[in-house]
Structure formats: C-alpha cells, structure tokens
C-alpha cells in the first residue's frame, strides 16, 4: 500500500460487544468484519492486525455512532494515539432498503463507509469540565422529574380517596401542604399518604440543595460571564443558562444561527416532490435536552405585556454590559410580540412556543458570538 492510504474502521458498539469492519476507498465493500468483547484494548489489537496488512504508514481512523457509551471509548482510543470520530446518527447516510435488515455487521460496514465518504456530521467532544457539569445538571433534572412524578401520585391518591383541596387554586403552596399533612385516613391509607409526603419532602430538599450547587457552578470563571449574559433573556435563569452552555460547548462551531437551531432540531421539516411542497413539524434531530430547555423557556413569553420587565429580570440584567442588555431587550420584545401575533392569527399555543424556541436559539447563538449589532 502507498503512504497515502487511509483505513476507515467502522465500529458498531454495545455494552457487551463491538463489531468492527475496515474500509479503504477503491474497495467494493468493507472487509475484516469481526465481533469482539467490549474492550478498547481489543480494538487496538484489531488495528495492529490491519497495520500488518496495510502498513505502518497508512492512516487509521475509527468511528462509532453516538449512543450509550458516551465519550469513554473515544477518550480511550485517543489516549492511545488512534484517531477516532463519534458520528451523529441522525446525519448518517442511509442506503435504500438497508434499514429493514439491521445487524451489527451491516451497521459496522455502514459506519466505515460513512467515515470514508464523509456522509455524516461529527459529534462535538466537550471539555472534561463541560461534561462533568452537563452530567450534574442532567442528574438534577432526573431528580426533579421524580419530584414531579411524586406530586402527581399524591394528587391521584388523594382524588381516589375523596380528598380534594379547595382553599386555593394552586397546589404545593404552604396552605396546600398544611392541609395535606392534616388529613386523617383509615388504616394503611394514612401510612401510604405519610410515606408519599415523606418522599416529597426528601426530593424537595434534594432539588433545593442541588440548585444551590448549580448556582455555585455557574459562578465559575469559565461560565460566569456567559451565564450572566444569557440570563438577560426572559425565561432563562442560571441553571438553564449553565445547562445550555455546558451542553453546547463551543458556539463558534456554528457558522450561522440557523445551523445552531438545526443542531437542536428546532427547524421545520419539509416534504417536497415535483411542484408540491409541504412543511412538516420540527425535525427533533440533535440535542433533545437543550431543545426541551428552550421550549420551556419560551413559555415565559406568554406571560406579561410586550416591553414589560419583571423585577426578577431587571435583577438578572443588572451589572451586564449595556450592549448585552440592549440585545436581550430587543430579543425579548420581538419574541413576546411574535407570540401574541401568532395567537392572534389562530396558531395553536404549542406551535407558537416551538417557533419562539427556534428564534430564541438564534438569539442565544448571537449573544454567545457577540453579534450585538
């Protein structure tokens, strides 16, 4: 083989096993398909066997789809000086008819070909600090989801046993909690309610403690300025701002705002054929966590008048540079006005919120890249 040979190694990775295949441009199909136990050392041995075939001077590039293994395998291979790429699954080329027959060997061959023909987008590899912060925030969100589920279970239990709170319109206020603790039921029912309330108290305390920790993380030098800037936008508090920054990492890797919103799966799909063109719902391709955060943030634009600033927003904006505040005010006014205009034109609230989330993503990209003009 000549010195310019590049060997592409597709890896279909799972918890228990890796299936590997190699491909060189000019060959008809990937070769040397092999299934091995899930161990990066065995991947290195596989590559060493290929070196005896293609030579030491050839370039070797491994790749696998983003999935349950995260970045662990990538870091192992890179530490052993082996080039590795993580492929975004939603961007990979699909061969017609192949999707109906899915095996590990086929997937490994497909990945090898995608690497060779560059028919994919690589996954951004976060810094170690970003990855730790991201995992911490996701852990907190999991516990918040447990808290929400526990609240729903308590309300369902109360309703099944004729306990209906009518003192105020809202649940989980001080009045509601006092009422909940004062209920007297027969036998095991009382024990069930007590256990539910005990679990609720534990989860509430845990979430509050984690929120304080996230607040402290957002004050780190690497994040403080960016978090301060993002919190000038309506609906984005420090935990949300920190989560977006840690999840995305380098905003400069997106050349345009539209690329960033597409990365989050917030752009509408399209079905075009001949003269016909049909707009579809959002693609939902990309980072689901940030997409959910921005859709939740967009809901805040449905509360308050155009141009109105709450006391909390004014406090968050205080101390930021004038150009940042002016940019945020422009975004806030435009998004709030757009929301009410869409409702006036008969659009459903959820459609309007999703449209706002897409545009909010564009404003976030502009702020992180200092596009204040």
What annotation goes with each model-predicted range?
Residues 2-24, 111:
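Gly/Thr-rich phosphate-binding beta-strand-loop-beta motif of the actin/hexokinase/Hsp70
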Residues 15-42:
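Short glycine-rich, Thr/Ser-proximal phosphate-binding strand/loop in the N-terminal lobe
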Residues 40-60:
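Short, basic/hydrophobic alpha-helical segments
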Residues 85-124, 131, 135, 276-285:
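Short alpha-helix plus adjacent loop in nuclease-associated cores
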Residues 141-229:
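Glycine-rich, often acidic, oxyanion-interacting loops/wings at catalytic, nucleic-acid
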Residues 228-232, 238, 243-345:
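Phosphate-backbone recognition surface of nucleic-acid-processing proteins
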Residues 337-373:
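Basic, amphipathic alpha-helical segments enriched in Lys/Arg and hydrophobic/aromatic residues
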């Amino acid at each position: 083989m000549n010195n310019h040979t590049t060997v592409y190694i597709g890896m279909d990775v799972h918890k228990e096993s890796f299936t590997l295949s190699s491909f060189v441009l000019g060959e008809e199909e990937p070769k040397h398909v092999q299934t091995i136990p899930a161990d990066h050392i065995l991947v290195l041995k596989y590559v060493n066997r290929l070196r005896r075939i293609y030579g030491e001077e050839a370039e070797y590039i491994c790749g696998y789809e983003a999935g349950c293994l995260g970045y662990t395998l990538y870091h192992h291979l890179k530490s052993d000086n082996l080039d590795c790429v993580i492929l975004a699954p939603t961007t990979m080329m699909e061969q017609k008819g192949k999707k109906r027959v899915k095996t590990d060997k086929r997937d490994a061959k497909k990945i090898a070909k995608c690497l060779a023909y560059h028919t994919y987008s690589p996954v951004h590899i976060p810094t170690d600090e970003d990855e730790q912060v991201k995992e911490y925030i996701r852990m907190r969100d999991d516990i918040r989801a447990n808290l929400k589920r526990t609240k729903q279970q308590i309300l369902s239990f109360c309703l099944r046993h004729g306990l209906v709170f009518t003192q105020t319109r809202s649940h989980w206020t001080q009045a509601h909690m006092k009422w909940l603790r004062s209920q007297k039921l027969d036998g095991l029912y009382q024990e069930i309610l007590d256990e539910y309330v005990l679990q609720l108290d534990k989860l509430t305390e845990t979430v509050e403690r984690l929120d304080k920790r996230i607040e402290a993380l957002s004050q780190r030098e690497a994040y403080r300025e960016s978090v301060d800037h993002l919190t000038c936008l309506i609906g984005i508090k420090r935990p949300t701002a920190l989560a977006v920054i840690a999840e995305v990492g380098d905003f400069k890797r997106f050349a345009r705002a539209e690329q960033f919103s597409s990365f989050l799966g917030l752009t509408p799909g399209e079905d075009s054929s001949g003269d016909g063109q049909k707009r579809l719902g959002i693609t939902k391709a990309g980072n689901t966590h940030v997409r959910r955060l921005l859709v939740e943030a967009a809901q805040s634009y449905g509360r308050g008048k155009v141009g109105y600033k709450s006391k909390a927003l004014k406090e968050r904006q205080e101390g930021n540079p004038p150009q940042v505040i002016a940019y945020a005010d422009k975004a806030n006014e435009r998004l709030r006005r757009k929301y009410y205009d869409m409702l006036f034109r008969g659009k459903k609230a959820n459609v309007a919120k999703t449209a706002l989330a897409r545009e909010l993503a564009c404003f976030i990209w502009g702020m992180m890249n200092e596009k204040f003009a």
